[in-house]
Amino acid sequence: MTFKNIYNALLDVLFPRICPVCDSVLASHEQHICTKCLTDIPITRYHTDKFNAMEQLFAGKVPIEHATGFFFYEKGNPYANIIHDLKYRNQPQLGRFVATLYAKQLVASGYFSDIDYIIPV
């Protein structure tokens, strides 16, 4: 066991990393969100639909090429904690983690292959 592993294990005991969705302690291999919550995340799949509900929302109001969202936000839903942690609890690393997850799906779908910029809202 390396010093880094011992140090991280000690940190996990003293300051356990908690899943923002279900408040369970994260396993050593989990990053930011536990495996169960990642599996159950209410993904929109808007990136698989041309002129999806989000694009319809912006149509005629804002000049956009495409619009999408990673997961459904519903007030009171435990997944709303992800957004709250980003906005109010200074958790930029959680944002990078979620953005990377969704970016992999977007790249695989080709949905944004002709887009120069993505603006997170």
What kind of feature is each model-predicted range?
Residues 1-121:
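Glycine-rich phosphate/pyrophosphate-handling loop used in enzymes and phosphotransfer proteins
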